[in-house]
Amino acid sequence: MKIISGSVLIVSCLTLILLIVFVKGCSYWQGPHSDHFKENRFINNEPNNTFSDHLKWLWEMETVEWPKWIDDPPQPRPLSYVKENNILRVTYVNHASVLIQTDGVNILTDPIWSECAGPVSWAGAKRIRAPGIKFNELPKIDIILISHDHYDHLDILTLKKIIGTSHPLILGGLGITKRLNSLKYDNVKQLDWWQEYSFSPTGKITFVPSRHSSGRGMFDKNKTLWGGFVIKVPVGNVLFVGDTAFGEFFKDIKRKFSRFRLTILPIGSYEKRWFMKSQHMNPDDAVQVHKKLNASKSMGIHFATFNEHAEQTVDAHEKDLKIALKKYNVPENDFWILKFGEGRELKM
């Protein structure tokens, strides 16, 4: 059943107008101009939607009714650590949150345990299912990767809780340090595209380009840098790309890293396609990336967690992924959709 969301349209239109009017805001990063930083804002190297595109999308918006709540079957408690360097274990938490364990290191991507993805509980996207790992069962986290600062990927309340239990290193794009000032936490490092950080004698993380955007309000559009992460560990390269559209930058990633043991790719929030294709990949795009990067395995994320004014059904990603896998002749067991809380292991 389709539902026209009038209140969403009005609020979104007002927000967009204010974004255009108030072009100056807090500066989260000050540095020299580059191919992706100009006039105090970060930019994509490929076309974005225009203001008129946004208005057209808002005018045409039709949301699809989702279930108010989905109960998932309980999964085993995650391991405290995976000590072996020839084993990689990944556990899907929810949305873009993935627990990555190998060589005695626990890495967590874009963690969110909050009930709502937004500035306040009554103005954001509501959760429709519980995280796959209960917070009190989360192992000690060594590194947190933040792909960008949208509310569904950078959740301050969750970060505060993890800092209180684990004191992890937080890695993100340029501007993330100032963005997290409210935490009063000093173990944060910001990276430019292609900048590297070595976290162990055998482990290295590289911040890589993506095609997306950033911002949390009316005055900070694209003031911080978005991107993905390549985790280089003995078992092989792992790509966590966060939120992204399909783009030419994947060719650059392929040239630099050649091959991947695992790619973690978004496969949700992709309709209406004419508008979302410059922000979010769909399952067809994700399978193409799987093939382009010579990935041994891939894993889909960013689906069916928050009701974000979705314009596709709650299970559309599963159906469309099956179609794409058949289209590109990729075996279904090479591209996973894990249950919330489900873990898988890869060995060298």
Each language-model region and where it sits:
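Cap/insert and terminal regions of metallo-dependent hydrolase folds
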Residues: 27-32, 36-40, 45, 135, ...
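Divalent metal-coordination and catalytic microenvironments
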Residues: 100, 110, 148, 155, ...
